Swiss-Prot record:
Recorded family membership: Belongs to the tropomyosin family.
Keyword terms, alphabetized: Allergen, Coiled coil, Repeat
A Pfam family reported for this protein in Swiss-Prot or TrEMBL: Tropomyosin
Name of the protein in its database record: Tropomyosin
Keyword Coiled coil: yes
Length: 284
């Protein structure tokens, strides 16, 4: 009986121990279950984080690819801008050289214009002198013409006198037989008339020579006037051509200056764009 009691007590103890172990096991299982649930929750969170990380990584890769593309595009633009700047620098150098040559041509044209102006002024002075001389020659020609008309009148008068003398001579010759005195008087008068006629003839010859010389001088003056007028016209033409050349060169210089200003503004704009591009690249 005691053995049974002992055994029952032992079994009860064992049962209590078993219950304790079962409770401990259940607690342990519950703890393990809770831990497993926490682990599974953490795993789910980790998976979500991994998925988010993968998404972020994909996005970062896309952003990196986009940034690389933008960087390559920017570098390409920078290279193109640098090439354009170099080309602009060469263009500016050429423009400056062209401006220097244009200034030299302008100086030369200005010197030629001044020379042409001086020549034109000199030609104008000569022309005025020649006009004055021409006016004097015209007065002389008028005087000679008046003298010639007077000589012609004298010649006509001499012709009339000669006709009268001839008529009287005929009358004297007709009356010669009737009156020697009248014939002698008539002969003396004929001698006087012949002397007068000789003087008139000499005057006519002198007037003819003077007229011929005056005509020769007038022709010479007219030739000189034509020569001076031609030289004056040529000088005026050269002056007009030089003035047009100066105007053309001035327009070309203005155009080059405008183009140079435009190129400088464009260079400034490109420099600002380059600075902005470098700032954007530095931001990446």
């Amino acid at each position: 009986m005691d053995a049974i009691k002992k055994k029952m007590q032992a079994m009860k103890i064992e049962k209590d121990n078993a219950l304790d172990r079962a409770d401990a096991a259940e607690e342990k299982v519950r703890q393990m279950t809770d831990k497993l649930e926490r682990i599974e929750e953490e795993l789910r969170d980790t998976q979500k984080k991994m998925m988010q990380t993968e998404n972020d990584l994909d996005k970062a890769q896309e952003d990196l690819s986009t940034a690389n593309s933008n960087l390559e595009e920017k570098e390409k633009k920078v290279q193109e801008a640098e090439a354009e700047v170099a080309a602009l620098n060469r263009r500016m150098t050429l423009l400056e050289e062209e401006l220097e040559r244009a200034e030299e041509r302008l100086k030369l044209a200005t010197a030629k214009l001044e020379e042409a102006t001086h020549t034109a002024d000199e030609s104008e002075r000569v022309r005025k002198v020649m006009e004055n001389r021409s006016f004097q020659d015209e007065e002389r020609a008028n005087t000679v013409e008046s003298q010639l008309k007077e000589a012609q009148m004298l010649a006509e008068e001499a012709d009339r006198k000669y006709d009268e003398v001839a008529r009287k001579l005929t009358m004297v010759e007709a009356d010669l037989e009737r009156a020697e005195e009248r014939a002698e008087t008539g002969e003396n008068k004929i001698v006087e008339l012949e002397e007068e006629l000789r003087v008139v003839g000499n005057n006519l010859k002198s007037l003819e020579v003077s007229e011929e010389k005056a005509l020769q001088r007038e022709d010479s003056y007219e030739e000189q006037i034509r020569t001076v007028s031609a030289r004056l016209k040529e000088a005026e033409t050269r002056a007009e051509f030089a003035e047009r050349s100066v105007q053309k060169l001035q327009k070309e210089v203005d155009r080059l200056e405008d183009e140079l200003v435009h190129e400088k503004e464009r260079y400034k704009s490109i420099s600002e764009e380059l600075d902005q591009t470098f700032q954007e690249l530095s931001g990446y």
